C-alpha cells in the first residue's frame, strides 16, 4: 500500500465526527449529474454518505462502495431507510461489478483511488455512454483576519501543512476548464463529452466545529498528536467564536464513449 493510500485510510479514526462536521453537496449538483447520466449509480469512496444521501433522495438506485469499515458503518446507518441504496465495504480497486452502471460518481475521494487502474476500472463499470461525475468541496475562511491567524498558527506548529485559504483556482464551466481537468487527471481517450460546473455557497460554523472539520482532513490526521493538539489549541484560542466560510463545489463530467 502506497503512502498516498495509507493517508487515504485515516478517516475512519473520526468517522462520527466526519459525518457531523463535513459539509454536504448542493441539490443542484445531483440534478445536473442526473440530467447528464441516469442510474443505476455506482458510488466510489462513499465515506459516511454525504453524497449517497443526496443521490438516494432522488430515487436513483445507488451501490455505494467504501473501503473503511468504520466509515461504512456510519454510511449503513445513514441509509438504513433507503431501499434503493446498497452499501458494499470494498475499495473501488477491488470491487467487481455485477452489472453495468449508467453513472459512476465520486465525492471528495477520486484522488485516493490508485492512478494506475482508476480509469480502467471506471470504464469497466460503466455501460457504453454511461457518465462519470467527480466532485469536491473546498472551503476557506471568508475573513482575512481569520486567514492570517490560521496561517500564523500553521507556520508555528505545522509549516508543511497548507490550510485552504482560497478558491479552487482553475477555470470551471468553460471549454478550457474541461480540457484542463482532463489533462491534469490523465483522462484517457475512451472518455469524452466533457463538462464542468461550479457551485458557490457559504456557511458559518463555531470555531470549535471549524477545528473539528480540520481534524477530519487527512493532512491533520497524520500529524503527531502533540503537534495537532498545539495547533488546534492555538486556533481555538485565536479564531474567535465563529468562522464564516466560503464554499466552492467543483463538478467534473465525462462520458464513457461507446
Give, region by region, the residue ranges found by the protein language model.
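Conserved Class I S-adenosyl-L-methionine
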Residues: 48, 171-174, 179-258
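A short acidic, Gly/Pro-enriched loop at the edge of an enzyme's catalytic core
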Residues: 96-104
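Conserved catalytic/acceptor-binding region of the Class I
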Residues: 128-200
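A short beta-strand submotif of the Rossmann-like class I SAM-dependent methyltransferase core
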Residues: 106-107, 115
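Class I SAM-dependent methyltransferase SAM/SAH-binding core
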Residues: 48-95
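A short glycine-rich, Lys/Arg-flanked "PGG" loop and its adjoining helix->strand segment in the class I
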Residues: 118-128
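Conserved class I S-adenosyl-L-methionine
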Residues: 1-45
Amino acid at each position: 500500500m502506497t503512502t498516498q493510500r495509507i493517508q487515504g485510510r485515516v478517516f475512519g479514526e473520526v468517522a462520527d465526527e466526519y459525518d457531523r462536521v463535513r459539509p454536504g453537496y448542493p441539490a443542484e449538483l445531483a440534478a445536473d449529474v442526473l440530467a447528464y447520466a441516469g442510474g443505476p449509480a455506482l458510488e466510489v469512496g462513499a465515506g459516511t454518505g454525504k453524497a449517497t444521501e443526496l443521490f438516494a433522495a432522488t430515487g436513483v438506485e445507488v451501490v455505494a462502495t467504501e473501503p473503511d469499515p468504520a466509515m461504512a458503518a456510519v454510511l449503513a446507518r445513514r441509509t438504513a431507510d433507503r431501499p434503493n441504496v446498497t452499501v458494499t465495504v470494498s475499495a473501488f480497486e477491488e470491487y467487481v461489478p455485477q452489472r453495468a452502471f449508467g453513472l459512476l460518481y465520486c465525492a471528495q475521494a477520486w484522488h485516493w483511488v490508485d492512478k494506475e487502474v482508476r480509469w480502467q476500472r471506471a470504464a469497466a463499470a460503466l455501460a457504453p455512454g454511461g457518465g462519470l461525475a467527480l466532485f469536491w468541496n473546498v472551503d476557506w475562511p471568508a475573513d482575512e483576519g481569520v486567514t492570517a491567524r490560521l496561517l500564523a498558527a500553521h507556520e508555528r506548529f505545522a509549516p508543511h501543512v497548507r490550510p485552504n485559504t482560497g478558491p479552487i483556482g482553475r477555470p470551471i464551466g468553460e471549454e478550457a476548464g474541461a480540457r484542463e481537468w482532463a489533462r491534469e487527471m490523465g483522462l484517457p481517450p475512451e472518455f469524452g463529452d466533457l463538462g464542468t460546473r461550479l457551485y458557490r455557497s457559504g456557511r458559518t460554523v463555531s470555531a470549535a466545529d471549524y477545528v473539528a472539520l480540520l481534524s477530519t482532513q487527512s493532512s491533520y490526521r497524520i500529524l503527531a498528536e502533540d503537534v495537532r493538539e498545539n495547533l488546534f489549541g492555538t486556533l481555538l484560542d485565536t479564531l474567535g467564536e465563529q468562522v464564516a466560510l466560503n464554499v466552492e463545489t467543483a463538478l467534473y463530467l465525462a462520458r464513457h464513449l461507446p
